């Protein structure tokens, strides 16, 4: 949130009815012996990513289960990210190999793809008229978001190039 002030800016405040349940949820987790973590000013995905990396350093294999596709960027040789497809009945297991097979990109490129496409749920505007197909094509040609902008001058004139230039700060 410090890198991009508008990040998640359109998100509604957590309803009081839900917030009131937090103490009961914490108590239930304690009684079940399930560790839980929270830290002011940090979102759950930040904590999940940090704990996952710490577990990897201790030679643990990690499985993250979530409905948040943003967590796909955390997949690596020791981390599988299971994304729910239909409620909690069906999951899709993302590994670096599966991401490459499914989309043709790496976990690092997944982050860049999101920057190019934007994400309304996180209030990330992205580049005008860049969707998944075009974003992936650009990443395959240039390797990364940085690579796209390093080579922008050699791209032929087009509306896409114009949008990339005009929306650079949004990517």
Identify what each model region corresponds to.
Residues 1-65, 69-93, 169-171:
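Noncatalytic, basic helical substrate-engagement surface that gates or grips nucleic-acid strands
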Residues 35, 57, 78-80, 90-171:
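Non-catalytic nucleic-acid-binding/docking modules located in mid-to-C-terminal regions
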């Amino acid at each position: 949130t410090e890198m991009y002030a508008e990040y998640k800016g359109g998100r509604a405040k957590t309803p009081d009815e839900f917030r009131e349940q937090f103490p009961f949820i914490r108590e239930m987790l304690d009684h079940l012996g399930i560790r839980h973590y929270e830290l002011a000013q940090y979102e759950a995905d930040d904590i999940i990513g940090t704990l996952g990396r710490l577990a990897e350093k201790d030679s643990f294999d990690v499985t993250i289960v979530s409905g948040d596709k943003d967590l796909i960027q955390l997949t690596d040789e020791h981390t599988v990210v299971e994304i729910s497809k239909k409620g909690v009945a069906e999951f899709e297991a993302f590994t670096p190999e599966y991401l490459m097979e499914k989309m043709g990109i790496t976990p690092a490129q997944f982050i860049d793809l999101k920057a190019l496409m934007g994400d309304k749920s996180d209030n990330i505007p992205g580049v005008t008229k860049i969707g998944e197909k075009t974003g992936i094509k650009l990443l395959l040609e240039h390797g990364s978001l940085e690579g796209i902008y390093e080579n922008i001058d050699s791209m032929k004139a087009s509306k896409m190039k114009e949008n990339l230039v005009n929306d650079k700060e949004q990517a």
